[in-house]
Amino acid sequence: MKNYVVSDPAIMMGKPVISGTRITVELILEKLAAGETFDDLIEAHPKLNKHAILSALKFASEALKADVVYPLKKTA
């Protein structure tokens, strides 16, 4: 699969984005977590495609595999 995710300090302050866009991986994750579908994202952002979204998910997965602990607060 082509890697659609790039990071350039001149674009979105270096946040990972989909190549050729200003659509951040963060935005894609937020929209999917809010219940939007791939089709919803593609309709709202025509420069996206299924492979770009999957690439963003793979990037996020790889980033979370780093040996970093993210303490989470328990909610009641």
Predicted features along the sequence, with ranges:
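Short, Lys/Arg-enriched N-terminal segment that forms or immediately precedes the first helix
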Residues: 2-17
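Acidic side chains
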Residues: 8, 39-40, 67
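Generic N-terminal leader/processing signal
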Residues: 13, 29, 71-72
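C-terminal structural segments of small proteins and small subunits
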Residues: 48-74
